Amino acid sequence: MGSGGSVGSGVPATNGQPLIELAGVRKSYGLGTPVVTEVLHGIDLAVTRGEFVALIGPSGSGKSTLLNIIGLLEPLTSGEYRLLGQSVASLGDAELTRLRSEAIGFVFQFHHLLPAFSALENVLMPQLIRTGHFDAAAREHGLALLAAVGLADAAHKKPAHLSGGMQQRVAIARALSRGSPLVLADEPTGNLDTHSADDVFALMRRFNAERGTAFLIVTHDPRLAARCDRIVELVDGAIAPRPAA
C-alpha cells in the first residue's frame, strides 16, 4: 500500500474490485415537512479492496452522514449504493443487519467500549450479540487480535484501566474481529494525543497492508490524511475536486 496521499475525486485510480459504490447519492432531512434540508448532493464514491482512504472536510460538510449511509446506519434519500456488489435499496432490515455485520467494522472517535466487560470480551462483543455466546475458538481469535494490536497482557483488564490509546486499540481489534473487508473509522484519533494518534494510525495501516482490509477514515488531521492512499474532500455536501499538487 502507498502512503503518499494522492488527491482526486471519489473514484479510485485503480481498477480493483469495488467494495462500495455510490452513484448520485443524496440525503435529505425533513421530508414531508415544510422545511426539507438536503445535506448530501449527488455523491459519487467508490472504495476498492485494500484501499486506505481519507475523508476530509469542514464540520457540517456531511462526512458523518455519508459514513452512516455507507455503514447502513441510515438510509439514503435517492441514488444508488452497492455494497459488495449488492444494491442495498431492496434489502429489508434483517438483510441490512446481516450485510453490515459481515462486510463492515466500525471505529469511532469515542471507542464505545462497554465498561463492565474486559478488553477480550469487548473484542468478542459482536459475536456475543449475534450468537449469545463465544466458544474457545472465538476466545483464541480474540486473544490473537489483542496480541496483534499490542495488548496481549491487557486481555482481562476493564477499559477504565487502559489508556485512551489502548482503548482505541481494543476498538480496532473489535472492528476486525469478524474479518470484515471494510472498516469505517470516524475520527479514530481525534480524542488522542499526537503520539497515541500516530500509533493508532500506524496500526490501522499495518492491518491494511498485512490483511488487505480497506479503511475509509474521517479525519481532521492533515498529517494523517497525507499518509493515506487517497483523499476525498467533502464541502457543503458534495465531493470537491482536488487539483494535483
What are these regions (language model features)?
Residues 18-227, 231-235:
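ABC family nucleotide-binding domain
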Residues 1-28, 240-245:
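ABC-family P-loop ATPase nucleotide-binding domain
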